From Swiss-Prot:
Family: Belongs to the WD repeat LIS1/nudF family.
CDD domains: WD40
Keyword entries, A-Z: Cell cycle, Cell division, Coiled coil, Cytoplasm, Cytoskeleton, Microtubule, Mitosis, Repeat, Transport, WD repeat
Domain LisH: 10-42
GO biological process, any: establishment of mitotic spindle orientation
Protein's cellular compartments: Cytoplasm, Cytoskeleton; Cytoplasm, Cytoskeleton, Spindle pole
Protein name according to UniProt: Nuclear distribution protein PAC1-1
Native source species: Podospora anserina (strain S / ATCC MYA-4624 / DSM 980 / FGSC 10383)
Length: 464
């Protein structure tokens, strides 16, 4: 036996461990032959010695396997970090340029108070308020700059599934929806008093979003909801009436995202599809159906205009489109993939990297990145200028499934707001400090703030 790489003592230990292993596995003839070959008499390998070395070989073997796995994991992690380093923007530029900013670990704040998994988060369009909803039936309002809980809102009788800030110009409201089949409206300027409850859906209400007042004559009074009853409904929040019902999905409608001009709505469903609706017409029908996912489609996002050049290049279009508020979209699924689509319903790219269900998506307001969260506990950043390559992974974003992600809306003076879409914010008259001043000349000021929520009961704030 070649033992050149072992010391004499190590070789003797190995020989005895092998003999003990052979003896324990009823291979006594083989063990005896090895003892003879190694000149180890019975007196040298007595029962006490055999007992001492019993199981040692197996322990050494499993230790080697564990070490090999750890080395492979570390090599993979090192490769990921090297890739991130090679493709990263210098830190000095990231700190100065919000367009290049990406979240990093650790989070600025971890917000703890919910007693059950967190399902949703939403930023106030101007102030440093964040709403979070949970399976504990409550909504909590936080000051995300200070990391402090401001109040707990009770009213729903089952899990809160989504929240959103928005509403009429100069009168920002908070909307929430629940497994109790209702949508509730709360007034932030009046201690979050419940001012209206909207019944009408026949099953759990999965998602709710205010529709921007970008279209001609838009008032900001419209709200869209998605439900397990397979429908989407559009509501007038000033009256509480359902003004349109959208039918087309064959299963539970999971998520909904309005376009910045309020004309289009993107929805996703358990029927494995996404659908784009033109809600400016009296009886909306799906304008485009996104077919390709192999499982339930849980989340969606509409790309901002700043992303058009990168997505157009990915789609092989020489000149980026500039006419529509919806030229490109993203969807995330239980099939663990993210798909990028054009307005015709053509899948232009499949982003692979998550190891579990993709739960939430948000485009960077600067247009270069798409961010995603998933049940693999991670937050991932995909670079649209590099064919959608994953350039950053926050592996410890949470200690359990990450269920939601929102980006604080950018701020522009005197322009209506919509939450989470890189849209514009305005004051609702609440006597609080704004979280950053409006940009000069009406230009949007990107707020480098992201919130995520998880089954680990934590809301996390990633901020510059």
């Amino acid at each position: 036996m070649n033992t050149n790489i072992l010391t004499t003592r190590q070789a003797e230990e190995l020989h005895k461990a092998i003999i003990a292993y052979l003896t324990a596995n009823n291979l006594s003839n083989t063990a005896s032959a090895l003892r003879t070959e190694l000149n180890l008499g019975e007196d040298v390998f007595d029962p006490a010695t055999a007992k001492k070395y019993e199981g040692l070989l197996e322990k050494k073997w499993t230790s080697v396997v564990r070490l090999q796995k750890k080395i492979m994991d570390l090599e993979s992690r090192n490769s990921t970090l090297q890739s991130e380093l090679a493709n990263s923007t210098p830190t000095s530029r990231q700190n100065k340029d919000p367009v290049a900013w990406l979240p990093k670990s650790p989070a600025r704040h971890t917000l703890q108070s919910h007693r059950n998994p967190i399902t949703c988060v939403a930023f106030h369009p101007v102030f440093s308020s964040l709403a979070s909803g949970s399976e504990d039936q409550t909504i909590k309002i936080w000051d995300w700059e200070l990391g402090e809980l401001e109040r707990t809102i009770k009213g729903h009788t089952k899990a809160v599934l989504d929240v959103d800030f928005g509403g009429p110009r100069g009168n920002t409201l908070l909307a929430s929806c629940s497994s109790d089949l209702t949508i509730k409206l709360w007034d932030p300027s009046d201690d979050y008093k419940n001012i209206r409850t909207l019944p009408g859906h026949d099953h759990s209400v999965s998602a709710v979003r205010f529709i921007p007042s970008g279209v001609a004559g838009g008032t900001g009074n419209l709200l869209v909801s998605a439900s397990r009853d397979k429908t989407l409904r559009i509501w007038d929040v000033s009256t509480g009436y359902c003004v349109k019902t959208l039918r087309g999905h064959a299963e539970w409608v999971r998520d909904v995202c309005p376009s910045i001009d309020g004309r289009f709505i993107l929805s996703t469903s358990d029927d494995y599809t996404g659908r784009l609706w033109d809600v400016s017409i009296p009886n909306p029908e799906p304008k485009t159906t996104l077919i390709g996912h192999e499982h339930v489609v849980l989340c969606c996002a509409i790309a901002p205009a700043a992303a058009y050049p990168h997505l157009a290049a990915m789609a092989g279009i020489k000149k980026p489109p500039a006419t529509s508020a919806v030229e490109f979209m993203a969807t995330g699924s239980r099939d663990k993939t993210i798909r990028l689509w054009d307005a015709r319903g053509t899948c232009i790219k499949i982003l692979v990297g998550h190891d579990n269900w993709v739960r939430g998506l948000v485009f960077h307001p600067g247009g270069q990145y798409l961010l995603s969260v998933a049940d693999d506990y991670t937050l991932r950043c995909w670079d649209l200028t590099q064919e959608g390559r994953c350039v950053k992974t926050i592996g410890d974003a949470h200690g359990h499934f990450v269920q939601c992600i929102r980006w604080a809306p950018s701020i522009v003076k005197d322009v209506p707001a919509v939450n989470g879409e890189g849209a514009n914010g305005e004051s609702n008259g609440t006597p609080r400090k704004a979280a950053g001043a409006a940009g000069a000349g009406g230009e949007a000021q990107i707020r480098c703030v992201i919130a995520t929520g998880s089954v680990d009961l934590n809301v996390r704030i990633f901020a510059n």
